[in-house]
Amino acid sequence: MAFDMPRAIRPAEVGLAPERLNRLADALKNDIDKGFVPGAVVLIARRGKIACLEAFGYRDREARAPMAPDTIFRIASMTKPFTSVAAMMLAEEGKLLLADPVARYLPEFANLKVAVDSDNPSAKKLAKEPMRREMTVHDLLRHTSGLTYSHLTGPLLKKAYEAANIADEKQTNAEMVAKLGELPLAYQPGSTWQYGLSTDVLGRVVEVAGGTDLDRFIIERICKPLGLADTGFGPIDAARSAQPQVDPASGNRPPMRDTALRPKWIAPAVGAHREAEAKADAKLRRWRQCTEQDRSRRAAPDFRRQVIGRHERNG
């Protein structure tokens, strides 16, 4: 694959110490030799130039298939920024407001309850109270919605999440939201930062406000304009795909979703413990660049400042 970013002749040209880059390479090789990881691709860029682009180890250790700079990885929760920028694009276009109640787009969230003392492991009953204020789109973007992951909350709320089968891979985004609408939040909206399903719900907001499926919005409005040809949802080129290594304890390779099929549930923010929905190679650095530098036109400067700004004092 071609990288359109120029290469630095020497790391020092962009203010990086070559001996420290060598330490990174040595550390990775050591971890690969010890079996901690099967392989890795490292890309370090600074001042608009690539200072380091190197592949280490194997993309499939059991098949002894070497890692390459254009190996495709499942990027798990790195899908979150794509979903968040999609929402910011719609906000820029006036199709949603960050201050809007989520219930404006998802009526299922109009009368949510909040679990009381949800983290208490000794609680005997899942007590609930009304929301003190409505959940907003801004809450979804900054993970202050009160939504969580089942494994990050107390036993009673975890049991409720699992009973509702929130992580069902056969469901649609709309079906997932309908289930969440029947469950209490872990915290009052705006009161607590909690990594969780906020971005999954934001993905459904994008679908409603944008009038199309989340995966199609991301591909057509973000990936194609940026030239991210190897980034998307769905089929992965098996000849370039990184594979999980065999679990030494079981002797089995961890199961992976069949990427030859388009999933019904386009989950934009699955945690690292689950399979990812999106795939990408080292061109992901172009995405990072375009969300940080003014030359990107995926979002206007004021919106980019909101994306990378601090939000803990905003309510």
Label each PLM-derived region with a short phrase.
Residues 32, 91, 284-288:
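Hydrophobic residues in alpha-helical segments
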Residues 3-4, 104-315:
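Short, surface-exposed loop or secondary-structure junction motifs
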Residues 7-8, 70, 201-202:
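Short hydrophobic "helix-edge" motifs at membrane interfaces and signal-peptide entry regions
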Residues 54, 100, 212:
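Short beta-to-alpha loop/turn elements within the nucleotide-binding domains of ABC transporters
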Residues 1-11:
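N-terminal pre-domain segments of enzymes
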Residues 22-29, 48-50, 74-105, 110, ...:
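Active-site SXXK
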Residues 12-75, 95-97, 111-119:
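Short, conserved catalytic-motif segment at the N-terminal edge
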Residues 37-39, 93, 97-99, 180, ...:
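Short secondary-structure junction motifs
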